[in-house]
Amino acid sequence: MPFEQTQLFCDEKPTILKKLDTRNEIADTIRSVSTSKISETSFQYVLKDVNICLPKINIPNEILMKHEVEKYRLLFQSKPQTARKSISVKTVSCAEECVLLCKSERAEDETVNMSAKILNFSCSKCQDSTQYSPNDLQKHFEMWHHGELPSFPCEMCSFSASDFQIFKQHRKTHRNTFVKCDICNSERSYTLLDLTKHFTSKHCVNGNFQCEECRFFTQDVGTFVQHIHRHKEVHYKCGKCHHLCFTKGELQKHLRVHSGTLPFTCHYCSYGAIHKDQLIRHVITLHKEHLYAKEKLERDQYDKRVAKTTTTGLKLILKRYKIGPTKTFWKRKTITSGNDESIGKNAQAFNIVSKTQTKSEDQSQEQVNGEKGEKQHCENGDKPVESESEKATVLSTGQYNKADEGASTTSSSVLSAVQGPTVLLVRNNKITIPANYSAKFMGFKMVDGRQHIVIKLLPANKQILPSPVLQSNTEKNSTANLSPQAVANTGFATGLTTKVNDTDFVKAAPPACSSPVLARKVISEKEAAFISEKNNTLQMVDDSKSLSSLPTTSTTSVRVTTKVEARDNVDLWENDSPQSHPDASDTSISSPDKVSLTPKPNAYSSGDMHNYCINYVNSELPAESSNSFEFSNQGSLPFHNYSKVNNKRRRFSRATLCENLQKESPNKTVTQQSTSDSDTASPLLRKESSNSDNLFASINPLNGTLKIKTEIEEPYNLEETQNFNEQSLFTNENQNLLNVTEEPKWNDIPSAGSPMMPRITSVFSLQSEQASEFLTPEVNQLLQDTLKPKSDIKEDSNNIPSKNLPFDCDQTLKKSEEVVIKSSKDFQMQDDIPVPSASVGVNVPANDLNSKCNGQEKQGLSVLQDVRDSEVTTKIPNIITLLKTQSDAIITQQLVKDKLRTTTQNSGPVYVQNPFLTSEQKNPVFVQTPKGFIIPLHVANKPGLHVFSGRPVPLVNTRSVPATLLVNKKPGMLLATNNGKPESVPTVKTENVHSYGTVTKEPCKTPFLKAEHNNSCLTPGLCSSIGNCVNMKTCSENTLPLKGSYIIKTSVNSSVKAVPNILPEQQGPKMNILDTVKQQNENLPKASLYTLMPDGKQAVFFKCVMPNNTKLLKPKLVQSSTYQHIQPKRPAGAPQKILVKIFNPVLSMSAFNNLSASNSASSFQKEIVPSKPTVHGEQKEPETSRNALPVLVHGLMPANETVHSSTTACPGSSEEPVYISERSETRVLRGKANCAVERNFNKRKTCKNKFAKIKTRIDQDSETAFVSRNRSCKRKYIDNYQEPPRKKSTLNRKGKERASAEDVQEAFGFSRPRLPKDSSRTLRLFPFSSKQLVKCPRRNQPVVVLNHPDADTPEVERVMKTIAKFNGHVLKVSLSQTTINALLKPVSNTSETTYNDFSKRQKMLKPVNSVKERFVLKLTLKKTSKNNYQIVKTTSEDVLKSQFNCWFCGRVFDNQDVWAGHGQRHLVEATRDWNMLE
């Protein structure tokens, strides 16, 4: 009996396919179903006398089941497919998803053999019609015929082979077989290859091959050839008509037409059809709604099955709106509480939950721009439990995409709070919330282009146990807005931000319960460790060593947590006190003596994993209330601030967090106990600004970047002042020991977005709001990632503040931004509370903070405290020391111990910052001043005044910290004076120190000169520009300090003593510098640099003069990397001898206030004393080393100047004197040192060739003044060579030049010297206007490479730098008018301007006689090979360009010939194997 195969079609009603219902017309119009290979044992049906219906349109049944109705329409519109891809095995689907694979058995059904390239064979042993591929036939014989060799017969002859490879070789012999065309019936013979070509050319109609004897058609010529040959075989002819069939199945299928039966009937009506495709067409046309209903039914059934398989619990439905780089919108959904889960002791902490308290759930839901909170206090006998707290949890979208309900057995990650049962468990991408808490979805947060989920936990039962006194004080004085600070967990992404509402939270416990509390804290801290993204290892924090044991005299234990944030259109304060104002946001903290709580040891759990620094800023409190300073005793993990800032309101907000402030009643000492935190990086002060003046920085443990978002300038309001009366800061050395268990390895992490790195984002305005709106977070992050240079900076060590650092200053902030700080020497030592060495504390007598600060800005002192390890000696040398580099072995040991911390910054005029500890535990202290001023400061244990200048002074870079430690990249200057005379100026070594540029448009105005006390020399540590600095990557073996001397001179009788600074390990000739410097130009007015204060004490005034047109200031030097490999090695500790000489006229208090730019400039220009260092040896110094440091002083240093440490000097090379002239034109006068000649400082007069000749030429078109120097004479100098008249005339001539150039002071800039041709050239691209956004170009645009030999101007250099930065992204560059003018006109004329020694080894600049060479630069260049470019022909925009699209791959061509040739290659590929019949 014939076997019947059933299948479902559009419903549960089956359709029967009988065995004889077959036909030969096979045309698959959509796709061919892949044949599933099944084993012989799994075949459950006897396939004897079975034929499967192969309709004309072969539609797999799963299409109907998958509801792809629209594809049915394409079935009848698309071209039929070749028969060679048809199959004999049908896939039958049913509603129960069972698939039955059937194979055709009939030998006459040779549909598979239609293929000219796919060969199938039948088994010669089984004698059935089952077709096998060569591999399947081989397996069949091995399985069923005991490993006998199969037989592969040739269909063209009687040849048979047992090996398929031999069979293939035999088939190649038939290629030369001559056959005739059966359609033409001519006598001409063709080979098989020629026959296919003949069919293609003669018998192909619109790409189809139609058989004249039957209805068969195909698009494949090989299949058509085989089909033609089949007609020669035995045929089955219909008796009622003349239809010929090749198989019995086809004949039986054809006989249905004459029988009048309709085997295919419709399930929805009485329609019947002979062929299946007719029925399909009928259903799609008339019964479409039934298909949709069936689709919906199956989808509902699928959803039910999915719901049964998933567990009940937490499930979120999140609606996302458009999310930009700077703004995030969301809808909030209430999250149901899940099951309660307890955390194990070894549970891995996956994220940080920041504690907040809000007054009500609705209030926190309404606070979109600014969240306001009210403090809640709870007391519990044994264990401090958070009665009402909101936990904000940041979850990565990738971690949460599959957030299902329920808990799993394996714990992959844990979101844990600090204390109590408030713990979110994340197991197998499922979030479980404790039963006593309810969760609220706060929305999405975009951080670094990655999306995260913010969840807030609310306690189910709210129990408020307030302390009346404490609550009243904190409500009035300690209310703060939320600062969006969250720990950037390494498990998610860089800088995860958790928007929470932090308010004061005070816990107290009886003394009897102190031990249990400590034990529980240690356990919770171990549970709350970090998961490092790099190694995914659990870093446990052991706090047993960091818990501070306090003396019994402490009566209260208060921990205050305050955060402040400025937000859009939201008042910064919700405070009852009238002192709050929108222009300055500070945290109001009540006096500690007003708080009375039960004393308990202040052991703060580091399980918080957000040990923020203490930034305890006083607000406008009464005078009797104790004021506190900012402390930074603990680091914090990095986070980004993505809060929205109103630019019209206050431009920054201070985020302060005071932890563990313990007040002692006898002497009112506030003690902070810090704990060990393995991954604490640095406290962060949020300063928000929407313009491009802010410096983006964030501490990122993932990629090792230290980004601190600070503000360049803060508006000063003179109406309101803040007085800090009698405030002094003391640090006890016994409390400066921090036990560090582990530190992340920063060496392996790339420094991304470091503030000191040259950031192109300032050029492309990627940091601004308008640019962020156009660029997606992924693109923005990609662009910033391309700017991440690897940091080769070596981490020297951490540092601690010096023992008992008193600071007393009287600061007056005036409208002209002049600050006078009077120094005092009446500091006294005060006893501090001893703390064991395993702990860290800062003892600050609250009644002895003796700092008087006037001004609207709240001035504060922030002390950075950090310790290398617990074995640091207690004796600390005096301050003003710089880092001593250590060996690589010591650095390797310290990688696990050292901790990176930086202090939070205010915008006040005075800061105390402590860089990192040296190997001798020497502690430099830097004081920040307003821009443009140098402040003398008297420091304890140090005679004389110490002058500090600049913006917040950058800290010294260390190797373990690829991210630089610049809090605010404003450079400063550090000088030391004693009784009106400069001291032996300490040394700053600049090897391993990068030279970076700021991102902001506001230029820096003073160089930063850091000094080291031992070596008695001074070197420029950092001189920043506006981001156009070249990153110097110098290794410790191949770095040399700057060559040259700065001469500091303050009065007639003052002298500078340069102490010889020769290290024992330094090789080569020794450098001997004489002791004294004699003064010159006695006819010039000489006066002391100091003026007297009203109390008779001296004060030093320095004012910087800066041209307004700072955007035209060009970099003076770019380091040539081509010379680094030829430099001899020099010990890393080799110091630098540079002296600075500053000349000032008599200035009074009133005269200084009215000091003009010309007066200040002329005072520095009068005297220029050349120094003659004595050098022994004949060692030749490379030319570039002498020019490695062009020191440009405008005031002290122009903002846009770049200073690099030279890497080309020999170890024994001479010291080159560098002369600093303070002039508005910021000229550079540099004497040249010859390595083979002795020169001493005793000679008052020098020769004419000692000085550089300055020739200035003002170009009004380009508004740029190019200042160049004449090359020094190559002949050697003799000691007694003097030329006084020429010396005097040179000075007079310079004075005339200064007078003539003062009128165009603001239009002056600097041109960079010629670089070697083999050196890398980089250019930077500026937008035409401030409103213009420079974006990455689109594709299909040619690359512009302005590598012209004459393209040496700074404008072109910027373009090249941009192209170099965005490797492969910059495809089009448009030039501004200034750039075009610079390109069209020659830079200089050889008859007028001379050139520097920098281009000695190169040819001189050729004068451009033709504009055509410059005009080439304006053309668009297209890269043809690695180093070759061709000019792209430009057409007028009015002419319509014709484009040609490739018919195969869609590639666009503008040239028809290229398009035609491209298409021919596709044709060749398509017809390559037509001569093969395999």
Curated annotation (Swiss-Prot):
Residues 1287-1296 have a biased composition (Basic residues). One of its GO terms (cellular component) is nucleus. Transmembrane segments: none annotated. Residues 671-680 have a biased composition (Low complexity). GO terms for molecular function: DNA binding; zinc ion binding. A zinc finger (C2H2-type) spans 152-174, 209-231, 236-258, 264-287, 1444-1466. Its main location: nucleus. Belongs to the krueppel C2H2-type zinc-finger protein family. This is Zinc finger protein 518A. It comes from Mus musculus.
